[in-house]
Amino acid sequence: MSQTSISSAPTALTPKVGFVSLGCPKALVDSEQIITQLRAEGYEISGTYDGADLVVVNTCGFIDEAVQESLDAIGEALNENGKVIVTGCLGAKQSASGSNLIEEVHPKVLAVTGPHAVGEVMQAVHSHLPKPHDPFVDLVPAAGVKLTPRHYAYLKISEGCNHRCTFCIIPSMRGDLVSRPVAEVMLEAENLFKSGVKELLVISQDTSAYGVDVKYRTGFWNGKPIKTRMTDLVGALGELAAQYGAWVRLHYVYPYPSVDEVIPMMAEGSFKGHVLPYLDVPFQHAHPEVLKRMKRPANAEKVLERVRAWREICPDLTIRSTFIAGFPGETQEQFETLLDFIREAELDRVGCFAYSPVEGATANELDGALPDEVREARRARFMEVAEQVSAKRMARKVGKTLKVLVDEINPDGGIGRTAADAPEIDGVVYIAPATKASKRYKVGDFVSVKITGADGHDLWGEV
């Protein structure tokens, strides 16, 4: 059972809810919001199936493997507990017959909702497990209940997406872009920093599009006007982070021209060191014909020019991206163009998926589907080239002294991350010496580490 137990003062009459959270960081934020509301209403969060009066499962439905994992988790919860409420992206998915997929596979579930549905989930919980008469709302921290370690947190700034990429079904499950009010985002960020968070990871389906749906409406924070726009929000978050000596990291940044305005914030002025020189930009491919079939921006030469311009302004910039190999119709020549792009762009961190048909995606209707073995071979070749590029860039860090955020302390020393490393998806820094590590620093501290070794993914160094 994959969930975080939240301590409280249980009584025999306290209703208890188990929680299973699957999927991406955006789904994790949904889980945090549901758990925060449960706690605010006086429910206890159980760490076991046996100790729970019912179980909520937050699902993922993006790719086939995630669908199966979610269905298996629902089945396990039904077997172990019997009372299950399902929410998340898979909850919005239909089966081939047109009925709700979850209800068709698991007809015994108590209720099913789609993603970002705190109100609907709470209604279902109330129906099957009435809330306590005297909830202690003031026991819930202002920052809400978080499922991440105390020193970092995800800050979701919008829901949904306006793009219609042919390989993606997210808009059909999460809808079009809906930006959160800028004052609401800033208040959450402030509460998180006050609670001890040292790193905020800004997430959404499309961070660059923040505010498009409200025409960049001006909001107010602490009496100051702030436009509902990515660059203005990043500036405000950077200013706030500087007050707490914290980091702000940007994820899911679609390569709009406005991104160019953010780079100087990473390189100079009062934001430097707080708005991290890190961009997570999902390029997906480099050949114009493949990008056209994906319905993605289709000019790799301009992308290369922008990457070079970004690095000229901010030499320490780390660029992470994701790609798809073996997309329908991709020729060997087009795949080689992708490899050339990786070599020329020298991206620091990349992930690659062998294309997999996703039920409901329009890419399934495209001609030229490739055999499984070809798709997987291209993915493996892509990662081989990407590893070579990454190892070359990582080697340049040897001998430098870098600021590291400590994530863990164990008998071998410390484990942390630099500004170039997002949690769980990027590399780590192994910190020596092991002796008296816990007396030198603690989890959530920033330490200066001299880098002594590197491979294509991780670094080694000494305090």
UniProtKB/Swiss-Prot annotation:
[4Fe-4S] cluster 1 binds at residues 24, 60, 89. CDD domains: Radical_SAM (cd01335). Pfam families: Radical_SAM, TRAM_2, UPF0004. GO terms for biological process: tRNA modification. [4Fe-4S] cluster 2 binds at residues 161, 165, 168. Binds 2 [4Fe-4S] clusters. One cluster is coordinated with 3 cysteines and an exchangeable S-adenosyl-L-methionine. Catalyzes the methylthiolation of an aspartic acid residue of ribosomal protein uS12. Residues 147-392 form the Radical SAM core domain. GO terms for molecular function: 4 iron, 4 sulfur cluster binding; aspartic acid methylthiotransferase activity; metal ion binding; protein methylthiotransferase activity. This is Ribosomal protein uS12 methylthiotransferase RimO. It comes from the Bacteria. SMART domains: Elp3. It comes from Paraburkholderia phymatum (strain DSM 17167 / CIP 108236 / LMG 21445 / STM815) (Burkholderia phymatum). Residues 395-463 form the TRAM domain. SUPFAM superfamilies: Radical SAM enzymes. Its cofactor is [4Fe-4S] cluster. It is found in: Cytoplasm.
